[in-house]
Amino acid sequence: MRFVRTYFSGFDLTLAVTATLLSLSGLVTMYSYADDNSYFHKQVIWLVCAVIGMVVASIPDYRFLRSGPSAFLAYLTSILLLLLVSAVGEVTLGAQSRINLWFFSLQPADPAKLALIIVLAKYFSKRHMEIAHFRHILVSGLYTAIIFILVFIQPDFGSALIIFGIWFGMVLVSGISLRHLALVVGLGALTFLLLWSVALKDYQKERISTFLNPLADRQGAGYNAYQSTIAVGSGQILGKGIGFGTQSKLQFL
């Protein structure tokens, strides 16, 4: 009982409730649209595993990551996994992004995001008084660029964008000056234009265009977004009830 009281004394209840509500809403959505509930059952199992993993990971004091090599080792391990997937990974939906293990498929880009957050948090926390110096933004950007490039060449443009967003968000809250922020935004815009011109494939450009204007091609690239809009709108405020959505039951989604 003492351990339980100690554990929950520092528990972030808001974060736990938010994550629980998001998870439950996802399960309800999956249960309502799927005729085959095998995916729903698998998701429940993985959710239970995730909760157990969260509890175990939250027991040690996270501040040990601030001292010692743990943060950098996590970062280095993520890079090695990304290099490994480029050599022996299986191709799924056009991207060589997964390592097939005997009981599940590992996507190294996911733990790489967590490792990047940890190493950047350690870097910024040790230099919070010097963050106004642009060199720290460049060094943190180099940490990010290595993972970004390894993920981008898989090619997994979606995960690469999330990795960039992690870095940009952490730089933004670290106390960056407006002048440096404007410079970062400008460099980001130039990098995006360069990627658009020489690196992005046609289907990746199509996804970006569809995200910006999902209704421009209702029968093509924007089909799912259009049908989702109908599904949400047809339910109005109270919804149609679990299992009674027309777009899901008639297999428009």
Ranges and model annotations:
Residues 1-19:
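N-terminal membrane topogenic signal
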Residues 210-253:
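TM-adjacent membrane-interface loops and short helices in multi-pass inner/ER membrane proteins
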